[in-house]
Amino acid sequence: MTAALMLAAAAPALGQPPIEQDLAALAKSAEAQLHQSFANLAFEDFALSPVHGPLFQASAGGRILYYAPESDHLLFATIYDKNGFNLTALSQDAAARAKLKHLDPKEALLVGPPDAPLVIEFTDPDCPYCRALDRFWAAKAAEGKAVRRQIYFVSGIHPEAASKAEHILCAKDREAAFRATYAGEPSKPLNRCADGAARVEAHAKAVKSMGISGTPTLILDGQLISGFSQAEIEAWLARQRPQAKPPT
C-alpha cells in the first residue's frame, strides 16, 4: 500500500492521470502475457473489457455461467487455461456428476446389452438430432460397439413428446416401440397406461433436477455432452474399446 501511494505521488502533473497511466501499463503487460501464454493464436486487437471486479461461477440449465457483480455482467463463456484445458467443461461435468443422485435407473428405459458401456441419455421422440443419435447408436451396434442406454424422456419441448414417451413406456416391448417411434412410425393409436404416465412425470422431475434444457444430452462416464457431438462420442467409444496393438 505504501509503495503504491509513493508511486502515485511521484506521478507527473502533466500528461495522463495516474489511473490512466496504471491502466495503460497494465494493459501492455496483460497483452504481452496473452501472447506468451497463447502463442498459437493470432490476436487482432486488445482492449480493456467492460467486465470489472471478481468473476463468480454459477450453473443454470446444465450450463456454467459467470457473473461479475461489480459491473453486473453475466457471461455465457468458455474458459480455457494456457494448456488448452476447457475449465468450463470440467466444471460442467463436475456439476452433472453431483446431480446424478437425482436419477433412478429403475425409472429409466434401458436399451442395449446389460454388459455394454453405459450411456445416460436425455432424449425427445420428436427431436431430429435425437433421432439421428439413435441411428448412430444402431450403426455402432452393427459394428459390434453396442452401448447400454439409460434413457430419460424430455417432454417439455415438443407438444407430442410426452404422449409418445408414454406410448413407448406402456408398450409390451418397449425397445421395439422406441425404435419404431424414433423411426417416425409409432403404432396408432398411441399406448396409454397409468404406469407409463407416472414414468413420464418421473422423467420430467429428473430432467428438471438435472438442469437439462436441450436434447439430446448425454452423460458418458461423468462427462456431460450437450447435443449430438459425434466427435466427442466417438472419442469416448474409442476409450471404452481401445484398438488392439498390431502383432510385433
Tell me what each language-model feature is.
Residues 99-117, 248:
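A short beta-strand-turn-helix
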Residues 116-195, 208-213, 235-240, 246-247:
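Structural alpha/beta surface segment adjacent to cysteine/selenocysteine redox centers
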Residues 54, 61-63, 115-118, 145:
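Envelope-exposed proteins and targeting segments
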Residues 40-46, 177-180:
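Short, surface-exposed acidic
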Residues 1-9:
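Bacterial N-terminal signal peptides
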Residues 19-23, 27, 31-36, 44-48, ...:
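C-terminal cap of thioredoxin/glutaredoxin-like
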Residues 14-16:
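Boundary of Sec targeting at the N-terminus
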Residues 73-102:
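A short, surface-exposed interaction/processing loop segment used at functional sites
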